[in-house]
């Protein structure tokens, strides 16, 4: 049953190209009192008045409304919240910009309290030195203004028009969260805080680029701190099925999760994906992980590649599009992997430097063939994006991704050869621990259960390739590091196959792995790390994720 509360109106500025100033108020000043969002299913519908340019929210599920959906706040019981929103399917015809604005507005309204919790948890993980805040704000302000200027100046360009859709959705998110805050009588989040959340992945590279260190010990590097992940695409020997999965690695402070289903009725001949399901977080208009199922037939997975060549980070400038923005635009516009890569390559910010796996299920004929273009691998570093068709590799059985660049140029320019020379083969593409484990064990994947198993695998005490390191394996548990435990590592897994993807369906589990007798993670050992809104103990099962409104 939906929780109901009185709906009120809020008059927003024009949603398209809304020049919202970056508020320079310190993020920690936005009201520290903890708010409790009652668990359960919260429904809401947004109505747009063209005459008054007002949004009205009613806490009902009205399929004739301009945007409608629900938020199932089940984080404490399953590890996941579930958000589903449909926009543009109501009784009145709306512009694409208004549809995107209302979709963002409704999401902000439904998830505002967890958005603030998530910001509170992540901010100290990224901002270690308060002196960097002004530099980050200045960069983001310049980047935002440049982006909005290009959207306004190039309305007939499909790329910039779709960038405008994404920016308009962010404007809606901000104002919807603001409305919810007014109802709850709490201080609203600033636009900077919401931009900060969406740019978390980009900030992993942006902050070091703004505060370069003269020297640092490579031995102090913790692999999970940069948002590293494990991903696997597995094809059965007779092409009977194709499985794909992703396990996220980052600080456990990021374990406030929402799985999202969006269906936006955008009428633009260049929009090839109007509907998507993906793993995400409160306040994020992207996955971050990444794990997307798109209505274009594309699947997008991603793992992060660190850039150890610090001179490359000097090339990061604000007159670019952040990675999260380019991913969203490419997801909306691309029909295939090559086109996705070409769109994503435009205006490369050089931040959140990743390996993207673009799997085109339209190219797969079960029991028969994987056509050319089934799998594109896309990798980014500052000033350069490289992509290639790696379907031939996939035909041999699998593609694994584990935070080491595949393309030789990216590998070399990022500084990995020096890392191998200094620290050993654990940083080589072929002989990293996860490369060896995936190569050894991928043949055991024959069904969904075995795919889940390999992606939660951590037998660090016994596996010779782990050598006793709880992070030299598929699903890292740095909190089990006997010498220096830290609350970070692998904290989820999402798994699907070609048949499930046709229904936008996946299986997802939240929390560090407990497979083969590992103890559940408990925050009582790391209470100094902020974890507002989370369960104290993570010991959940896989949850079936599937949209129910359409």
Curated annotation (Swiss-Prot):
Gene Ontology CC, one term: lysosome
Top-level division of the source organism's lineage: Eukaryota
| Gene Ontology BP term (one) | lipid catabolic process
> What subcellular compartments does it reside in?
Lysosome
Q: Which residues are glycosylated?
A: 72, 309, 367, 412, 527
* Record-linked InterPro entries: PLipase_B-like (IPR007000), PLipase_B-like_dom1 (IPR043040), PLipase_B-like_dom2 (IPR043041), PLipase_B-like_dom3 (IPR043042)
What EC number(s) is this enzyme filed under? 3.1.1.-
Broad class of the protein's primary localization: other
Enzyme class, broadest EC rank: hydrolase
Endpoints of the signal sequence: 1-39
Indicate yes or no for the key word Iron-sulfur: no
List membrane-spanning regions: none
Please give the subunit comment from the record.
Answer: May form a homodimer, each monomer is composed of a chain A and a chain B.
Instruction: Output this protein's name.
Output: Phospholipase B-like 1
- Organism equals Mus musculus
What gene name does this entry carry? Plbd1
